[in-house]
Amino acid sequence: HLVSLQVYHYLHCINALRRAAYQHVYGAPTKEHLNHLDHCIDMLRQAAQCQSDLTPMLYFNPENDPNTMLIKSHQHSCRRFDLVNEWAMARSQCKGNTTCAIEVGKQVGGEM
């Protein structure tokens, strides 16, 4: 079985989309890669809907200006990714790889 935390899957998908956006650097995606990108877009859509982040977003929209601008100074209350990553790596059977095959029946990780 493969085991990984969903956060690593999200980061993988964001990186895949980033690479597709910079085709001039990474090359055009193949048909198989485009199918993978569709999967990534849907996975991130599901994450956004499931997590339903309620952080208020402030916009600047002067009168008669057709261009609404997002003010990027909003604060999120987040988990500390460095601590999540440290926790996951301490329990990994994969020596730093975020996804690996685990032998069936083998004990994985430790206490939560």
Swiss-Prot record:
Motif window: HXXHC 1: 9-13
Broad enzyme group: oxidoreductase
Residue ranges annotated as motif HXXHC 2: 36-40
Keyword Cell division included in the entry's annotation: no
The EC number(s) this enzyme carries: 1.-.-.-
Signal peptide: none
GO molecular function: oxidoreductase activity
Origin superkingdom: Eukaryota
Keyword terms: Oxidoreductase, Virulence
UniProt note: phenotype after gene disruption: Impairs the production of victorin or of any victorin derivative or intermediate.
Pathway in which this enzyme or protein is active: Mycotoxin biosynthesis
BP-aspect Gene Ontology terms: mycotoxin biosynthetic process
Pfam family, any one: UstYa
Function noted in UniProt: UstYa family oxidase, part of the gene cluster that mediates the biosynthesis of the secondary metabolite victorin, the molecular basis for Victoria blight of oats. Within the pathway, vicYb catalyzes the oxidative cyclization of the core peptide. The pathway starts with the processing of the precursor vicA1 by several endopeptidases including kexin proteases as well as the cluster-specific S28 family peptidases vicPa and vicPb to produce 7 identical copies of the hexapeptide Gly-Leu-Lys-Leu-Ala-Phe.
Family: Belongs to the ustYa family.
Free-text note on domains in this protein's UniProt record: The 2 HXXHC motifs are conserved in ustYa family proteins and might form active sites.
Protein name listed in UniProt: UstYa family oxidase VicYb
Source species taxonomy: Eukaryota, Fungi, Dikarya, Ascomycota, Pezizomycotina
Gene: VicYb
